[in-house]
């Protein structure tokens, strides 16, 4: 069971470091959840496809449509395997619809996916993320199906089932001539405005006549003149399935805006269409139609949600409605059958006897019980007999569990049963099934379900009346002819008329799902426990601590949480072969003072889940009494608290000067506060408390003498709290900080400022609420709403959001938390905003477009923490109005800079440690495949650098006329005139991280812009990384792989063209040197200098190399490094190095470290002391640059102040501009031609 867990070397028990954080378990893709008790499958929402799900479920629960589609075989529709072949005519939409219906019927999953179907629609621009009208989809989908089925036996499927005919007639009052026009309809559109119900509107449309008279006469063709006439319409041909679309959306011409009509509009469960038909000689039943589907829209005209009420005609689902059961429907059975039905042993034996090989997984046994009897184990037996697995374990004489307890079977002596026994078993199951509410086939109680995307719930037929009116009301009605009867073999048979190839595919998929669920369940059932071995611990300083080392004291054990505490105890006994005496397992916890034991794990028959043992739990293994001879107190009450105590001590021996000393002390939480005097050896005095770690600016509270007997916990102290102890003869105020204040009550109230951000017309803009650190956020919010005189409705749709010092609204705080838990400081400001705070499973995220943003420009969104990065990106793109697929997400760091991209697009936000309040950046550009880099390539031409092959003017001729230099100012590069770092964008390049530097150069030379330069060799190119729009790091060693440079996913490179080949060694440093012009504050052209640092990075070595290069005496030159971002020069001399030597170690005598940080590409100024002995290295441009920096800093300061003021007054005006709504996207389905 445990593999090599118990071998002597204990290789499976890690000696991990004690006190580390919990590991993040990387979860694989979990299989979809099985169907719930209704045994019906929903459809997963792709982001905005609730309208599609509702219509597809309606078609699926139209058996005649479903079976007609199933009747079309691969010989007519083709095969999905051939869809990518150029000459194959594969009708993808009907094939995907067949597969979806088969999955909804047979695949054991909570919800099916429509991704394959929407892909067959040709949706490639995130159409599934947009909301559309279901009535429009109904017409477009049927049109697409008709086009897809051209040339097959199902070419008239839609026309045969859904098309009807309306005839419009005009009768001349003079000659009685009838002029008529016939038109087909797919659905009847009926008005809602000013109409009470469906039957009234049908009367208006197909019973009442419109009279042409007076000023509105009709021109009769027979009479050839204007005459009186009557116009009417009738239903000439009725389809088997009648679709009715309610026109709830209208346009207000006064306000010039759309609105939804939410007035009451009734419709019958059965309707007689005979009064509205042209022919009425048929039997009345031919005109009767029964309602079987109602698509419901919740929301307004600019957005909302669809779900559907559906009648299960074939009784495919498990429908339960306890209120419909009459008291007379009581099963009178033999007393023996009732007693046996109540015996779980008999029931479970019966189920196992009906299984193949009389064996079944334990997890599926409960599902079988629910399916066959209609009642779950927990509901009928758990209270008396305990959990199912435990019940099986307690009856080993009947049930045989596998070694891993995953499957169960009957023992051999229980397998042989007489026919009478088998018949009795069937009767028992029938008895239970008949007792189960809702499983009796009562035809008088139709089976209706509410299908809301993935979720399916049974409803009563009378619940339909609730959808007559309101924001959530009926939008489409579907009726079927009452004469349509279903064959008996279709009843409760989901396999009826499903093609054989789809049956095989679904059976194989179900087997695979079972295997995946078993594997996932096994993987999810193991967790890690940290075993703290009692003999390796000692008790001192108020808590438990490792006696030798944490490695020997703490072991990690991976264990199955479905096993019992007895199994865990036995496993630990086997691990610790030398253990003597009793073994007690207790839950422990790491606290600041050390390790503390809380409670003992009792009940060896309880599983770890039932004992509430969590993943990563710390388990203390000991004898339950003492550790190292010291008796241990356990429990929450005596939890050790680490307190910081301030008290006066003499500053030294014989000194009378006292100083305030802070020292940590550990006390049990249930100890009296007066124990502080004992710990300090002080007989008596005064105690002042501060609940935070710093005394600066906080409130000190004096403990009255009568409260000295109270415990630390009763006084509200916690880990890190400060206690100030004063002798009884000292001045009470002498030790208090200047900002502190003396308070005599523990319950003194502080204030919290609440600002109104609800865009209301309330006169009050902000209020102060009296609070303590233990006040609940919900109470503060409700009180603020009352004092701001806002509407009571805001209590259900508002939240509190802290405001930072820049006026930005932060993440909403949960209603259930206290101010202390929410980390809201006293005296701070919070905003009362519209919208609910995120739940514990949701994240509140900020996001913004691009990478160059400033605080306050972000949008916000609330998403589930289990959402994948890909889905989160789609939602953010939709909300920001962006289109396309070339986007990715980056997490912004604390200084508002774009961080690394979120590459694992299938990982959840929770797995990537995304937290509420984080800011994500929508960055344009597609992420490269794993193991590849995608980076911009620039052409770099240093300004006026001597020794280079071409000038910039010449290079401009080589590039196209459309290419322009992007000049990034160097902020004062040295020279007689303004200089700039010039970068020309060449294009993006994607390359493998396994490629070498020389391969990168070769691939860069293939870029169209570079090929015009006709560079003869890769050795004539230097490659630099680009940071802050300037070259940063020089890449050398041609045969080194790119991954060794650790470029990162945000790397940018630039190429520099050389006049001659060079091969820099690992110790060569490239410097730009400039000789200062005597008598002027300027420098000559820059020249490249290669410095070999083999002898060290010393100032003397660099000075010697410069002197040799310029043929000058080394004692007659002075050199300095230029810092362009500061417009400053720092002289490099051996004297500076000597100062550094005295302050630091000798091995730090290097120019690589501070204050020079010398690297490739740095500018070195050189001064010839024979002609210029002035100490100044600066230029006129440096003076100008410094002035500009001062001016920019002042402007930024003013800008921040203005922005802060604007943020605080953001909602001060009552008028809020109308929300901009983008153009609505059209809905379309792309179908190939099959004519």
From Swiss-Prot:
It catalyses: Thiol-dependent hydrolysis of ester, thioester, amide, peptide and isopeptide bonds formed by the C-terminal Gly of ubiquitin (a 76-residue protein attached to proteins as an intracellular targeting signal). Disulfide bonds: none annotated. One of its GO terms (biological process) is proteolysis. The keyword Plastid does not apply. It comes from the Eukaryota. Its EC number is 3.4.19.12. One of its GO terms (molecular function) is cysteine-type deubiquitinase activity. The active site is at residues 50, 305. Coiled coil: none annotated. SUPFAM superfamilies: Cysteine proteinases. It is an enzyme of class 3 (hydrolase). Keywords: Hydrolase, Protease, Thiol protease, Ubl conjugation pathway. Transmembrane segments: none annotated. It holds the Pfam family UCH. Residues 41-482 form the USP domain. Belongs to the peptidase C19 family. PANTHER family: UBIQUITIN CARBOXYL-TERMINAL HYDROLASE, UBIQUITIN CARBOXYL-TERMINAL HYDROLASE 40. This is Ubiquitin carboxyl-terminal hydrolase 40.
